Swiss-Prot record:
Subunit structure: Member of the pointed-end complex of the dynactin shoulder complex which contains dctn4, dctn5 and dctn6 subunits and Actr10. Within the complex dctn6 forms a heterodimer with dctn5. Interacts with plk1.
GO terms under cellular component: cytoplasm; dynactin complex; kinetochore
Organism: Xenopus tropicalis (Western clawed frog)
Major location category of this protein: cytoplasm
Location(s) in or outside the cell: Cytoplasm, Cytoskeleton; Chromosome, Centromere, Kinetochore
The protein, known as: Dynactin subunit 6
Top-rank taxon, per record: Eukaryota
Family: Belongs to the dynactin subunits 5/6 family. Dynactin subunit 6 subfamily.
Entry annotated with the keyword Cytoplasm: yes
Function: Part of the dynactin complex that activates the molecular motor dynein for ultra-processive transport along microtubules.
Keyword list, A-Z: Centromere, Chromosome, Cytoplasm, Cytoskeleton, Kinetochore
SS bond list: none
């Protein structure tokens, strides 16, 4: 049985030997998640099984207290007109604090502030900048080249927009619950000592 546990705990690194995954103490990252490339995960961030984080075109830095649910896909990919083997400067994807990536969402947004929610099966393209307090509604697709203003809600089959008065509340209680429960049922990726995530500006 011990052998099986050790195999599970190393499976992530075997999938991508060139990867450089740094997990801050206090983060909960399940081994069944798939993380490739240069990825830094901040404290109190929870990554569910089957979530995918691919740093292909440059590093991904994920801040504190983010919730990344099952089958969510965060990807720092190459632009469509650039081949993966071409010599381009790596661009860093930065995700702030207290963001929620719901089941089956797909985010390529290169810059994201704090307290945003990308709901189930929503898509956010790489040229979109999410500021803070935004909600991208379930199944909505946002693939424009724009900065989404703070507290914007995009919703419905026509991706209508409105501005809410308050930003979404951080999922503090849910994170606390998941940080207690997930380790009981899933093996976790090992944390990395002495890593620093960018401080809030």
């Amino acid at each position: 049985m011990r052998q099986d546990v050790s195999l599970l705990s190393t499976s992530g690194s075997q999938k991508n030997p060139l990867g450089n995954v740094k997990i801050a103490p206090g983060a909960v990252v399940c081994v069944e998640s798939e993380i490739k490339g240069d990825v830094t995960i901040g404290p109190r961030t929870v990554v569910h099984p089957k979530a995918r984080i691919y740093a292909e075109a440059g590093p991904i830095i994920i801040g504190e207290g983010n919730l990344i649910e099952e089958q969510a896909f965060i990807r720092n990919s190459f632009p469509e007109n650039i081949a993966p083997d071409s010599d381009v400067e790596p661009k860093t994807m930065i995700i702030g604090t207290n963001n929620v990536f719901e089941v089956g969402c797909y985010s390529q947004a290169m810059k994201m502030g704090d307290n945003n929610v990308i709901e189930s099966k929503a898509f956010v393209g790489r040229n979109v900048i999410l500021t803070s307090g935004c909600i991208i509604g379930a199944c909505c697709q946002v693939d424009t080249c724009e900065v989404i203003p703070e507290n914007t809600v995009i919703y419905g089959s026509d991706c209508l927009r409105r501005v809410q008065t308050e930003r979404p509340q951080p999922q503090t209680l849910q994170l606390d619950f998941l940080m207690k429960i997930l380790p009981n049922y899933h093996h976790l990726k090992k944390t990395t000592k002495n890593i620093s995530t960018p401080m809030k500006s």
